[in-house]
Amino acid sequence: MHKSYTAIDFETAQGKRWSICQVGLVRVENEIITAQLSILVQPPDNYYWNRFIDIHGITPEQTANAPTFDYVWQQIEPFIKNQQVVAHNGFAFDFHCLKQTLEYYGLATPEFTGHCTYRIYKDNLASLCKQYNISLNHHEALSDARACGELFKIHLKTYNNERNNKKTSRK
């Protein structure tokens, strides 16, 4: 199974998927975190909905001088392009955020293989972190990405153990 993967999380400034205001990214290789990125991003027009500020606590003042996504993409792309990428609720949210934001800035969406810990566990991130005793500062992108990476690591260990047990029982 996958020995290396990137866990990602995006926070948005409003209801538009292309309004990314924070990127959290964790690279895991052989069960060890080898890289982490937490980047505040200025969304288009630095425009926020108040209810989104209430969720993640990021304000227009914090991103007023932050780079826009097209400038930070070169830092992020190597962790995504041709990689195994995991996000919690990735197919409903994070992967769409990435694609729509890249389209907004006229950038190509790279090939990657997506995985979703919500689809694997069928529960929300906060509940899973409590269940598995994983530290979480919910809606802070790096913390969410780190938690997602830990959940995926647990899944991979469980999957590999089940596969090994099936191989052993066939002998």
Describe the residue ranges of each PLM region.
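Conserved non-catalytic scaffold segment of RNase H-like nuclease domains
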Residues: 1-107, 111, 126-139
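Active-site flanking residues adjacent to catalytic metal/cofactor-binding acidic residues
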Residues: 8, 115, 143
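Short, charged, surface-exposed loops that flank catalytic or proteolytic processing sites
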Residues: 140-143, 161-162
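Short, flexible loop segments at boundaries between secondary-structure elements
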Residues: 112-125
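Acidic two-metal-ion nuclease catalytic site recognized across multiple nuclease folds
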Residues: 1-3, 149-171
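Generic alpha-helical structural context detector
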Residues: 119, 130, 150-153
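Amphipathic alpha-helical interaction segments
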Residues: 97, 147-150
